Amino acid sequence: MTDKTSLSYKDAGVDIDAGNALVERIKGVSKRTRRPEVLGGLGGFGALCQIPAGYKEPVLVSGTDGVGTKLRLAIDLKKHDTVGIDLVAMCVNDLIVQGAEPLFFLDYYATGKLDVDTAAAVVTGIGVGCEQSGCALVGGETAEMPGMYEGEDYDIAGFCVGVVEKSEIIDGSKVGDGDALIALAASGPHSNGFSLVRKILEVSKADVHQPLGDTTLASALLEPTRIYVKPVLKLIKECEIHALSHITGGGFWENIPRVLPANTQAVIDEQSWQWPAVFSWLQQAGNVTRHEMYRTFNCGVGMIIALPADQLEKALTLLKAEGENAWHIGHIAKAVDGEEQVIIQ
């Protein structure tokens, strides 16, 4: 290098102009998700949001998550427009477990080389997820980091804040013997278990474009995570909800006990639903044990709700009216020390 050589940030692999072009592309996305509590627009150093009116003792609830290695499959198949929905879903579905209404969302998009079209597709999906959950997309970070990611590979993370009345926090403490359990159907594997999914695809040498029911294997795997916010918030207003469990990483065995008091167990009726075809395919193609399936995947159940048995029919009617595929999946029973907290029979 001579003394006359002048290097720029772009020479180092960071294109500020591309970043600015992306911001212009996504301004409309943010605007469509706006809530009245949000002050200001995109571009500030921080995003401002008021607590909604009507809360006496508001408690903020926060959560952060990613999409895991589902992204690898999406990138390989050049399907970028739905992983943003997955990202929002993984965060907001966790918030409603405590009974919280999501308020605002921020995203982090990191890549080795920024492709504006790809990033815009991802953020547009984030906007769709925010609209589905009534959550404002108030900002984010786009990081172009040459040398950190291979080519145009990218990773995304989300952060969400919601609010709940202190006296209405759902923490599982009211769960008791005889409570009914309701399942809300999942749209597919959602955003968990994809390292195993990809291993099964590798070992079985399966064609991801093969037919699977009325769709393809690829489409079934990449179907965006269902967002349960609006129907569940409506249910919380109409029924006495004792607990909610978002069936994510760890499946049934890990997630249901997170909301159960000691000396209680969830008894799941395996005959109450049929696994969607994608899970049967995964089990067969990977020779995966039943226990491992329930530990890794949601097996068609995205959320489980515990409530008094006398409110079961009312809740099912409401959920179905809201467009959810909901069914009676089991009940809560007493358990003695040392007993499993989840029984699937």
UniProtKB/Swiss-Prot annotation:
HAMAP family attached to this UniProt entry: AIRS
Catalytic activity, as annotated: 2-formamido-N(1)-(5-O-phospho-beta-D-ribosyl)acetamidine + ATP = 5-amino-1-(5-phospho-beta-D-ribosyl)imidazole + ADP + phosphate + H(+)
Pfam family, one: AIRS
Domain of life of the source: Bacteria
Gene name in the database record: purM
Family named by the database record: Belongs to the AIR synthase family.
SUPFAM superfamilies given in the database record: PurM C-terminal domain-like, PurM N-terminal domain-like
GO molecular-function term, one example from the UniProt record: phosphoribosylamine-glycine ligase activity
Protein name according to UniProt: Phosphoribosylformylglycinamidine cyclo-ligase
